[in-house]
């Protein structure tokens, strides 16, 4: 049709058009232009994250004619920077969104620039649609720019070729002269009509982004996303805007989604204004642009300048900014005028209200009437969310994960995510690519995370829908795939520590508070799939439970609701971190007993042959230890909620955990581990300054975890200790062996965790390659050790390990022939070698044939158009576009898809059909690859036991290597301890130093000689001034014993020990307010445990016992305890005290040696110089006044204190009868004697009185 005819026809329809223009333009503002910047004429990543996965019906026929298309919302045409530059418009209505902060900007990369979706009025100001169009078509680009690259939201068939009417067989793109002409009824298909605003809906489109191109470096996208269903989120590489001449492609505006309220949900701010460019005088293809923009303009006035006044816009029926806002808010209120009643009156699944004792905050009751009113997407969401009300649910919508309702409020309030504040279904969103980061952030704050993923692609759904006979709901299928908690993380990227993270279930059996409780314990490290179980009877102070919790330090706890005692809860709180997660679950229905566990094992496919194929430990516990099995049942149930039960249980990795291991290891209870700062320091609970931090120099993560176990249980057998020392000495003295070990260890990934992911079938191809490469290094290293060092290592523990390690050479060689390792590592896909997988080969061949057909078609087009420069161009999901020079005419039935100043890109029906066949073939090929990946993992997992054994042997070598490295770091002097097997205990250290302090202050630390047992007394009573180093000396002796029995060198010139059976410590002064126990009560309780459990080969450390009560009572208790230790038990140890008279009482005892920490005192200036030297004798005073002076107390206060101290000393001397034992003068013990009806006090029966005290 000519330009003149168009004008005449437009005049005839002018009146009718004016009547409808107000209605049709309302819909314009529900569409937001997608403004993006792309790399010029190269890989156009502007379409990479292009299409939204809207929840609109999946079976909508998009292949209808133009008239049908025009009745539905179309994508609008965004404008490039040049379209806005230098146009004569009102300064108050800016065409560009203002710079602002990015609420979704990920802290993972501070340099990453992300553009911001804006609401319509933010990006358009007060401009009318007509003004936007006119200003966008009246400018000339300075360089080759994208002037027409709409990316289709609809299917290929939706691009009806009838809109390209022409009389000639070939034509140029529509002339820009049509912009000033009137349109006839014939040309109305070029201008899509707009619908009025739809009700909020959660139906979704079946479009998918699987074939989007990844963003390329050099592209900076300025995206404006239309609504919360939009899945376009672009993460461009950071580049300088001045470094590229890439223009912003003209893109379609996404069709209106039915569940939006007019606000942009995924709003991401533009970092900086777009540089202005010179305007151009005329634009080509303006009529086509009008069609693409999708706005129906009744009578656009021809404007040369491209400017328009607000008044003129209003005359043309365009709403001003306030009117638009009002219309939008009215529509919003209409659909969201009241909140769901069941969200106001919250009840759990059993309809218990908040505050009810039986209220379960994990569930939500939704009445049947509400289900009937839900849209398909709402129904899908609430079906999952109603059982996860205590969990933040990340719901996948295309390229976003979205959080709704209370979860959205958390995201907004805690993490400042952009909130779409609806009355119902308020929402925040994050990009799909940043899920791991945001999930880690939520977990770090203590939240549980649920992940709901799309279980099918849009194209896959379309293929399935064609095969179904029954009509399905038009919503993409989604399902709960993961629930993440801090104690059950399995993804290596989310794990913040190389050490094990445990989730523990505790079952208690207790008849009354005064009885000894029994416990069943089961805990798991989900990153490796290892279960640990035990059952024991404890004392009323929960000593064994305290020891186990201190060793394991669980991150998450599962307890039986209303079935665990308050004493046990207090004991648990004392041992675990304040950040640990507590889960109280229902008895019987969730905290299963052994009968229920047995039924579930039989019913489920967890082990081969059901219960018969279960691990031996589990089967024996089922018949013998019901409490432990009940704890396992609770953990079993919990893992099922997290979708981890099959992955974890099917590994069969069960063992029995013995916290004390009394027959084989040095026993250290929880109190000792805390007092000696073995794993956590007393400052901030961290590992800095601890013995573990000093000694653990393992290279591999699985080596560190094994070393932690070694340190929890140092050896007791002299033979085993010497075997370890031999290996450590061999590695330390042989640099070649040391270098060989380090050479293969430092390149290994965390194989123990990675093979558990392979077993679960959740490993990425790149990680699977890392696993295979890691085992190749290990296998090669063991081969080298066998060939080169077997003669040296023979007869040692290292030689046994080298000989015992399985040789997996043949299996690994088979894997090298299975698939392309490089492609799997770099591209994340398994490409099997030809002939390895027939199904894959057939699918690959079919795809190649389809691609060949496409290129044959391209050659045909080259001949048809007589142009040899034609080629294919991929723009996002619109792949294989035929790129044609702009001066070449194309057939009339070719549909233009995008273009630049020099080239245009087209589709036609023939090309679309072939492309669709190729895309469907690729979709089916993905399913084949998924099945093939599963086969690979099953085959690898068939040798799980051999792989795990290889890891354990490697971890042991890593621990030996760590001990040799730690010895070298101790500083001189250090020595190999001499281990002496004899009946009586014996310790000898010459020039002993504290290893942790010595590591940072080697030149200033004062060493000391320590001798206990043998020909010397078993017990040293230690006196000395405050701050003289008594507590440090006590700790360094204990640590030296632990190091020696661990198999490590010790920081001494010479060391000789008899292996100890246990170490007990009573240090410091603390009360226990929660248990209503005073400082003195805590002291006596801990002392009572020591007296009950220590033996002749125990090392006991008591620091200032009796400080928590009066002088006489404290002295009496100290005397009685010390007498019992040296006379009845005969253990080795130190007893530090400030009771000088106590030394006098034991001056002639043959098993007591009186020693002091030396100090030089200047009485004139009240100055004490601490010498930190251990020497024989009794310190005459504690020099408290001198320490008070050093602390800065006022002189008047100190003078008064000295005067009072002198009076008290004289009064005590006159009162005490030198012939009486001071212990017998204690009022405390006299009261006890009367209350217990015990005979008159003697040194023999004082321990009996103390033992009766609780």
Curated annotation (Swiss-Prot):
Basic and acidic residues bias spans: 8-18
InterPro entries: DNA_mismatch_repair_MutS-lik_N (IPR007695), DNA_mismatch_repair_MutS/MSH (IPR017261), DNA_mismatch_repair_MutS_C (IPR000432), DNA_mismatch_repair_MutS_clamp (IPR007861), DNA_mismatch_repair_MutS_core (IPR007696), DNA_mismatch_repair_MutS_N (IPR016151), DNA_mismatch_repair_MutS_sf (IPR036187), DNA_mmatch_repair_MutS_con_dom (IPR007860)
Modified positions (Phosphoserine) in chain numbering: 205, 299, 307, 309
Region (Disordered): 1-324
Biological process, per Gene Ontology: maintenance of DNA repeat elements; mismatch repair
GO cellular component: cytosol; MutSalpha complex; nucleus
Subcellular locations according to the entry: Nucleus
Extent of Acidic residues compositional bias: 204-213, 251-262
Gene Ontology molecular function: any one: guanine/thymine mispair binding
Signal peptide: none
UniProt feature, compositional bias: Polar residues: 79-90
Pfam assignment, any one: MutS_III
Family that this chain belongs to: Belongs to the DNA mismatch repair MutS family.
Matching NCBIfam families: PRK05399.1 (NF003810)
SUBUNIT field: Heterodimer of msh2 and msh6.
Role description: Involved in post-replicative DNA-mismatch repair. Has a role towards base-base mispairs and insertion-deletion loops.
Name listed for the protein in its UniProt record: DNA mismatch repair protein msh6
Gene: msh6
